[in-house]
Structures are given as C-alpha cells and as structure tokens.
UniProtKB/Swiss-Prot annotation:
It comes from the Bacteria. This is 4-hydroxybenzoate octaprenyltransferase. Catalyzes the prenylation of para-hydroxybenzoate (PHB) with an all-trans polyprenyl group. Mediates the second step in the final reaction sequence of ubiquinone-8 (UQ-8) biosynthesis, which is the condensation of the polyisoprenoid side chain with PHB, generating the first membrane-bound Q intermediate 3-octaprenyl-4-hydroxybenzoate. Its EC number is 2.5.1.39. It comes from Neisseria meningitidis serogroup A / serotype 4A (strain DSM 15465 / Z2491). The gene is ubiA. The keyword Transferase applies.
Length: 296
C-alpha cells in the first residue's frame, strides 16, 4: 500500500487515535494491574506458574486495561478538555466518535474473553464481576465520593482469578492479598488524583483527593500502612521464607520517600510519585518470587 495514499493515511490516523485511547504508550496502568496478578500466580503455583496460564493473564490484563482506558475516556469526554493533564486526549480534541470508542471497547473485551479459553470454569465465572467493575468504574466519578476505592476492587480481581485458575479455588490468602491491593490502589490513585485536584474541584468530578480534602496525604499514608501491614499478615499466614520479609523495610523506605514528595502537592511531583509505585510492585514480586524459591 502506498504510504502516501488517502486510505493509508486514514488508517494510520485511526490506528494512532485508537492506540492513544488504549494508552498503549503509557504502560504504567498495565504494570500496576500485572504486579498483584503475578503475586497471586506465583503464590498459588508455589513459584512455578503454567506458561499458558501466565500468558493468558498477561495478555488479558493488557487488553482489559486498554478497554478500561477507552471506556474511561468515553465517560469523561465532556470533562477532559477542562483538565490540564487530559486536554490532549482524542475525545477532547474531537478526533474520535462515541461509536468508535464503544466498538473498540467491545472488541478489546472480546479479545480478553478469548484469553479465558484455556482456563477453568471458576475463572470464567469470576471474570464477570471483574468485567462489570472495569467497565463501570469511570462512571462512579459522578456520584461516588471515593471512586478510587471502586477502582481498587477492579484492579484486585486478577488475584482471586489467578488463584481460581491455578488452584481451582480461592484460598484465604487470596483475600488477604485482595484487601492489601485495594488499599495500595487507593493510595497510589489518590496521589494520581491529587495531580488533578484543582481541575476536578472546578468541574465537579468526585475523587478521593477531593473527598479527603486537606487530609489527603494522611489518607494516602494510612492506606500505604494498611497495605504493608496486610502483606505482613499474608507472610505470616503462608509461613513466608526469610526473603519475603526483606521487602518490608524496602517498601517502607519507598513509602516514606513518597510522603516526602507529595507534601509539596505540586502537580508534576504527585504524578511522578504515582509512577514510582511501580517500584513497590516490583519489590513485592521479587520478595514473593524469592519466598517460593527458598521455601522449597
């Protein structure tokens, strides 16, 4: 195909728009979804996850995160133009139609559903509330005072699904990990919301940063503390090897550094602090990986 032909240029433009809607150039959301899923897969499989299951969850996570981003932009299409961070998104620039976004969301969900084929029926069943949470979260910002808590539920459903896929049932430690991840998500997404707080107050969007008001930093650190405490409880429940426990002082240091950073409440610093949570996910994955290795 001639790269200068009208058809090629049209297809290239549509592909660019769709990839931007999917946040394909911003993998942080996929990583923050993958870390707790990987924690669960490694714990449930004693450190040796089946490659087909691992691939299914990895690809499925990317696809569902992408679908969530598209439906999020659809839901926020009337607000994104008024927010500094989102004013250049496709809807805000008038580069995409509502029908296109809905069809792209449906297509991505269909592809994600195909990833369930090699998994058991319990995993299929648990994917239904996961799908519901992922697709409805963006609309909670209109009426729910802490939508980040709802997002925490959506971002944590990979955990019981992973246990269901590997063990055939959801063990108690899965729910401890689930609760821990809800708190972690609430912490880092509140920091994310702090970056947009002034804009959200003007347009009337509800976020945890708005709801917590001047106690937003205290709320973030309480959630971080609860997350780390529950990870310690998880370690006790599974009889974690010594390597697991080395994560706690490292994570506490990373959390303190986040506290020191967000005290300024500067928009860019809050956004960079949100991104830094990828390190916490990586540290805990390394600790769980080491636990499964040394516990054998």
């Amino acid at each position: 195909m001639n790269p200068k032909s009208p058809l090629f240029l049209r297809l290239s433009d549509r592909l660019d728009v769709y990839l931007r809607l999917m946040r394909a150039d911003k993998p942080i959301g996929t990583l923050l979804l993958l870390w707790p899923t990987y924690w669960a897969l490694w714990l449930a499989s004693d450190g040796i996850p089946d490659l087909a299951v691992l691939a299914a969850f990895t690809i499925g996570t990317f696809l569902m995160r992408s679908a969530g981003c598209v439906i999020n932009d659809f839901a926020d299409r009337d607000f994104d133009g008024a927010v500094e961070r989102t004013k250049n998104r496709p809807f805000a620039q008038g580069r995409v139609k509502k029908k296109e976004a809905l069809l792209l969301t449906a297509f991505l969900c269909l592809l994600a559903a195909l990833c369930l084929i090699p998994l058991n029926h319990l995993t299929w069943l648990m994917s239904l509330p996961a799908l519901f949470l992922a697709l409805t979260y963006p609309f909670t910002k209109r009426f729910f005072p802490i939508p980040q808590l709802y997002l925490g539920l959506a971002f944590s459903f990979g955990i019981p699904m992973a246990f269901a896929a590997v063990a055939g049932n959801v063990l108690p430690q899965a729910w401890i990990l689930f609760a821990a991840n809800v708190l972690w998500t609430l912490a880092y997404d509140t920091v994310y919301a702090m970056a947009d707080k002034e804009d959200d107050l003007k347009i009337g969007i509800k976020t945890s940063a708005v709801t917590f008001g001047r106690y937003d930093i205290a709320a973030v650190m309480l959630c971080h503390g609860g997350f780390t405490l529950l990870m310690a409880v998880l370690g006790a429940v599974i009889g974690a090897a010594w390597a697991y426990w080395t994560a706690i002082p490292i994570v506490l240091l990373l959390q303190y550094r986040q506290y020191a950073a967000i005290k300024s409440r500067v928009r860019q610093i809050c956004f960079e602090t949100f991104l830094a949570n990828n390190r916490i996910g990586w540290v805990w994955f390394t600790a769980i990986f080491a636990h499964t290795f040394f516990a054998k």
